[in-house]
């Protein structure tokens, strides 16, 4: 599957990514083969959201089940392999429950992507989906 390259604008999220990545860390490690940095890189893809959604629908994602935490309402997460500019690999994560609209992409990796890519809010980042 080759959907081409997408571009998104970096933005600071609500700060929930680090919390949830930490909670799901063991299951993410088991499913993805690495321990993700505790946080997500948030990108707004704007007009490309519909094309990206179509590509994600056709992609084979990995379902990551939530850990059992009494009293918490957690949902599954779908993860899709991605290559970010500069050859850095990670996964787009799509939680079944989210506060974000369809134009937002959250990416996890085993490194702190903002440092590795030397990016900050407002910068553009290019990425592409990979076959698993």
From Swiss-Prot:
This is Riboflavin kinase. The gene is ribK. Its EC number is 2.7.1.161. GO terms for molecular function: magnesium ion binding; nucleotide binding; riboflavin kinase activity. It catalyses: riboflavin + CTP = CDP + FMN + H(+). CDP binds at residues 13-18, 111-114. Pathway: Cofactor biosynthesis; FMN biosynthesis; FMN from riboflavin (CTP route): step 1/1. Catalyzes the CTP-dependent phosphorylation of riboflavin (vitamin B2) to form flavin mononucleotide (FMN). Mg(2+) binds at residues 40, 42. One of its GO terms (biological process) is FMN biosynthetic process. Coiled coil: none annotated. Binds 1 Mg(2+) ion per subunit. Gene3D superfamilies: Riboflavin kinase-like (2.40.30.30). Keywords: Flavoprotein, FMN, Kinase, Magnesium, Metal-binding, Nucleotide-binding, Transferase. It is an enzyme of class 2 (transferase). It comes from Aeropyrum pernix (strain ATCC 700893 / DSM 11879 / JCM 9820 / NBRC 100138 / K1).
């Amino acid at each position: 599957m080759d959907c081409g390259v997408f571009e998104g604008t970096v933005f600071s999220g609500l700060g929930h990514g680090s919390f949830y990545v930490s909670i799901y860390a063991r299951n993410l490690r088991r499913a993805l083969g690495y321990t993700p940095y505790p946080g997500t890189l948030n990108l707004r893809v704007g007009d490309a959201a519909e094309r990206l959604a179509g590509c994600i629908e056709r992609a084979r994602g990995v379902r990551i089940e939530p850990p059992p935490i009494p009293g918490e309402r957690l949902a599954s997460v779908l993860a899709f392999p991605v290559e970010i500019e500069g050859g850095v690999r990670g996964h787009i994560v799509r939680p079944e429950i989210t506060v974000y609209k369809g134009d937002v992409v959250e990416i996890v990796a085993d490194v702190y992507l903002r440092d590795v890519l030397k990016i900050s809010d407002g910068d553009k980042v290019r990425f592409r989906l990979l076959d698993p």
